[in-house]
Amino acid sequence: MNVLRTQKYWVNQFAINFACRNTYVNPMFLRYFHCAVPRAISQRALKPMDIPFLQCYIEPIDNTSFFLHPFKKIRFWWRYLFYGWWNLKKNQFLIKRTFPDRDFSIAEIIQNALKLHSGVNKALANHDLQQLEELCTLRTAQILKQQALNQPKCIWKLEKHISKPKLLNLSRAQADLKGEEFFVQAVVRLHTLQSLRTDKGSPKIEKPDIENVVIQQRSWTSPIRWQLWGSVPSTPVNTVRKTLPDGQVTFVAKPSKKSFLKQLFSGKE
């Protein structure tokens, strides 16, 4: 495989950022444990094996100058403090209170995200399907195993961290009716320089990348471990906060003035 083809392969095929960006699971799609005895006999409530991404505010990368756009910058700071920093601290306190014997410190979560990011990329490049099953959630493992079978082996390497990893969010979701078991998801931003080559003698293609890596754990499995869920995009700057009918908060794109006027004069509601 020549360099040009390798570069095309990098852009179109490889890396968690491209493989898992569309791993949002439909809310109606839940995978459950397979029980050896009927539920009527065992009376054990079935728990989902995987869940969709827990919607939250993902701090965007903002390079706006305060002197050129002071109101935009103040709005960005306010959103970060209220929806980012405060929400992270609140959820961290609640999760620590629920699981006092577990380590949910920022340093521990970031360390696990770094290990999973490197481990999954290396396993994907080396076609290590067993390792992918071990390190990834159910849905993500299925996607990456299929991708590994459709691409040649290669050598992936993390060259360096361009900026320091940052924990953006920590969330939990109830997994049973009693409220005793939970899913926990964490979002960590990684700004790295990665390289890819087909073999040791071929030239390497380097690529800087910013990824919002999502890791997840289930409180009822043993041993308790983090797994890679995928990656998600940042919340766009031009979004507005919206409360859904079920009480969850999400951010939707704000319509531009041009589209608003077009809709107004077209008579469409």
From Swiss-Prot:
| Cellular component aspect of the GO annotation | cytosol; mitochondrial inner membrane; nucleus
Query: What GO terms describe the biological role, i.e. biological process, of this protein?
Result: protein insertion into mitochondrial inner membrane from matrix
Identify a single GO molecular function assigned to this protein.
ribosome binding
Superkingdom assignment: Eukaryota
Q: Which Gene3D superfamilies match?
A: 3.10.450.240
Q: Which InterPro entries match?
A: Mba1
What Pfam families does its record include? Answer: MBA1
Protein name per its UniProtKB record: Uncharacterized protein C13G7.11
